[in-house]
Amino acid sequence: MLILSRKENESIIIGEGIEIKVVQTGKGYAKIGIEAPKSLMILRKELVQQVKDENLHSVVQNDIKLDDLSKKLIK
């Protein structure tokens, strides 16, 4: 992992067409702005993780329901 120090209004460039700018800093947080092509999806990591967790939970629940159903069909 590359770690860089940036002050407010300073930026980094990633590849072609992606700029990440520190907009504001405060105690324990930093607000960043991202300029990127509209074709590039930008998501917060915690939202991606939340969707993964919900999908996993849904699969586990469906497995349990299928197991119950198969037991009823065997009887």
Swiss-Prot record:
Organism superkingdom: Bacteria
Single GO BP term: mRNA catabolic process
Disruption phenotype: No visible growth phenotype, increased expression of the flagellin A (flaA) the major flagellar filament component. Flagella appear normal, the average swimming distance decreases about 20%. Expression of other flagellar genes is not visibly affected unless flaA is also mutated, when an increase in their expression is then seen. mRNA for flaA remain localized to the cell pole. A double csrA-fliW deletion expresses the same amount of flagellin A as the csrA deletion, has 2 wild-type length flagella, a wild-type swimming distance and restored cell pole localization of flaA mRNA.
Expression triggers: Constitutively expressed (at protein level).
Keyword set, alphabetical order: Bacterial flagellum biogenesis, Cytoplasm, Repressor, RNA-binding, Translation regulation
Gene Ontology cellular-component annotations: cytosol
InterPro entries, A to Z: CsrA, CsrA_sf
Pfam families: CsrA
Known role: A translational regulator that binds mRNA to regulate translation initiation and/or mRNA stability. Usually binds in the 5'-UTR at or near the Shine-Dalgarno sequence preventing ribosome-binding, thus repressing translation. Binds mRNA; 77% of enriched bound RNA is for flagellin A (flaA) while another 13% encodes other flagellar or motility-related genes. Binds mRNA in 5'-UTR or intergenic regions, binds consensus 5'-AAGGA-3' in the loop of a predicted stem-loop structure.
Similarity comment text for this entry: Belongs to the CsrA/RsmA family.
This protein's name: Translational regulator CsrA
Organism the protein comes from: Campylobacter jejuni subsp. jejuni serotype O:2 (strain ATCC 700819 / NCTC 11168)
Gene that encodes the chain: csrA
